Structures are given as structure tokens and as C-alpha cells.
């Protein structure tokens, strides 16, 4: 069993249900690994990075998951700032010998928000795919307009069933990441 410190926004936290209904809780059930939930609703990538840098983590932590970007878009932070925050996060994790996994921002049921999220997902993939684990949970959520409408309570926060599906989908990918790193 390994432990992963998970930093992010409401989608890490499991809003509106809370950490026990988050996708991390489901991944924990499936894998038997421990996923520490450090999600804070409303956080932007700079907030998440700041918490990561200032929080005292258990000494045995070797893996960090990071999910952010949607709140940055909502608050009209430029994509450039988000990418800089992700790069700083990767460099910080490398300096502390943490293995970083970046969770791609989810496509929402809000088309105006997706005009910014879709390009951000592409740029994150282009910039970080060769440098760290990228975890794309979108297949568990869906992509068609009907799937997206059904997946979210309010256009951006998943239903409890979708959080479970995200965790079930993520579990083997996370297990593979942890096993691969463990064999180094």
C-alpha cells in the first residue's frame, strides 16, 4: 500500500458531497492505496501550489496528484499563469523527490467554460506528457452534450455516481503509476 497526497480544488475535495464521496475515496477502495484529500473548493493553481509548498506532509509521501485550472479560468487568470504554476509545481516536486501526477481539467457541461478548458487540456498535454504522469478522467465522465449534462449537478461538479465512476476508472491507472515508480 502506498500513500498519495492529492492537492486540488473542489474536484479533488468531492464537492458538494465531501471527501468520503470523492473520486479519490473510490480509487482508494479499489486499489487499497491511501489518497490523502487536500482539495479546497475555489482554489486556483497558484493557491494549490502554495498549499503544497507550505503543508507538512507525512515523511513517507513520494507521490503527489495535482488537479486545478477550472477556477483559474472562471477567475479569468491567463492560461500562461496556469502553465507557469504547473511548471513550478513539477520543479518543486522534483526538488523534493516527489513523483507528480497532473489530472487534466474536466470538460464541463458549460460550453463557454469549455472554450477555455479544451485548449488548456491540449496545452497541458503538450507541455507535460513527456515529463510526468497525466491522468485524464474524461472517459469516466463522457464527452457528448447529453453525457456532460447528466454527469454534473450544476454544470461543473459531478454527481456522486460520476465521482464513483471517475475513481473506478482512475484506480488501475494510479495503481500502474505507483507500481512503476515502486520498481525504480
Model regions: which residues?
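Residue-level recognition of beta-strand->loop/alpha-helix junctions
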Residues: 37-39, 104, 136
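Oxyanion-hole/transition-state-stabilizing segment in secreted/luminal serine hydrolases
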Residues: 17-20, 46-85, 102, 108
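Serine-esterase "nucleophile elbow" of acetyl-processing enzymes
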Residues: 1-41, 46, 51-60
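Catalytic His-Asp segment of secreted/periplasmic serine-dependent ester chemistry enzymes
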Residues: 14-16, 110-184
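Glycine-rich phosphate-binding loop signature in dinucleotide/nucleotide-binding domains
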Residues: 57-61, 96-97, 177-178
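Helix C-cap/helix->beta junction micro-motif
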Residues: 31, 96-97, 130-131
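A general structural detector for well-ordered alpha-helical segments in enzyme core domains, enriched
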Residues: 23, 27, 51, 82-89, ...
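Active-site segments of SGNH/GDSL-like serine hydrolases
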Residues: 67-68, 89-120
Amino acid at each position: 500500500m502506498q500513500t498519495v497526497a492529492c492537492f486540488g480544488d473542489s474536484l479533488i475535495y468531492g464537492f458538494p458531497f465531501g471527501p468520503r464521496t470523492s473520486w479519490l475515496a473510490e480509487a482508494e477502495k479499489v486499489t487499497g492505496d491511501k489518497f490523502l484529500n487536500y482539495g479546497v473548493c475555489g482554489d486556483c493553481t497558484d493557491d494549490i501550489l502554495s498549499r503544497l509548498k507550505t503543508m507538512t506532509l507525512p515523511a513517507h509521501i513520494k507521490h503527489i496528484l495535482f488537479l486545478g485550472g477550472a477556477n483559474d479560468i472562471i477567475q479569468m487568470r491567463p492560461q500562461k499563469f496556469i502553465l507557469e504554476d504547473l511548471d513550478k509545481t513539477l520543479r518543486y516536486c522534483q526538488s523534493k523527490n516527489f513523483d507528480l501526477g497532473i489530472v487534466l481539467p474536466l470538460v464541463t457541461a458549460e460550453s463557454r467554460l469549455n472554450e477555455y478548458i479544451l485548449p488548456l487540456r491540449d496545452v497541458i498535454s503538450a507541455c507535460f506528457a513527456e515529463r510526468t504522469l497525466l491522468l485524464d478522467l474524461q472517459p469516466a465522465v463522457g464527452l457528448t452534450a447529453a453525457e456532460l449534462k447528466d454527469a454534473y449537478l450544476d454544470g461543473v461538479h459531478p454527481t456522486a455516481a460520476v465521482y464513483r465512476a471517475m475513481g473506478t476508472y482512475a484506480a488501475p491507472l494510479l495503481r500502474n503509476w505507483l507500481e512503476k515508480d515502486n520498481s525504480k
